[in-house]
Amino acid sequence: MANKLFLISLLCVVLVAKIAQAAPQYAPGEEPSYDEDTDDKLIENDTSITDEDYAEIEASLSQAFGTAADPGRRLGEGKKP
């Protein structure tokens, strides 16, 4: 019983230490600073895609891929005679 109590108290101490380390560290009176993303330029959506581009994409979707043999399987394994 004492072992369980010791283990639970140790886990509580570890949890409190983790929470304390995760908290932001500021000096007394110091204001937190936040990153402002005002320097990033806005990029508009690319509208230069054409019907030909869509046709190429559609054609590529019907092509077979991932047809290599699975090295984890043995031929004939799992088949019943």
Curated annotation (Swiss-Prot):
Instruction: List every stretch annotated Blocks active site cleft of host thrombin in a reverse direction compared to substrates.
Output: 70-73
| GO cellular component annotations of the record | extracellular region
Major localization class: secreted
What's the domain of life for this entry?
A: Eukaryota
Q: Where in the cell is it found?
A: Secreted
One of the record's GO molecular function terms: toxin activity
Residues carrying covalently attached carbohydrate according to the record: 45
A Pfam family (short name) is: Anophelin
**Secretion signal span:** 1-22
Identify the InterPro entries for this entry.
Thrombin_inhibitor_anophelin (IPR018932)
Keywords linked to the UniProt accession: Blood coagulation cascade inhibiting toxin, Glycoprotein, Hemostasis impairing toxin, Secreted, Signal, Toxin
Q: What does this protein do?
A: Salivary protein with anticoagulant activity that inhibits host thrombin (F2).
Record note on quaternary structure:
Interacts with human F2 (thrombin); the interaction results in thrombin inhibition.
Of which family is this protein a member? Belongs to the anophelin family.
| Name of this protein | Salivary thrombin inhibitor anophelin
What is the organism field in this record?
Anopheles darlingi (Mosquito)
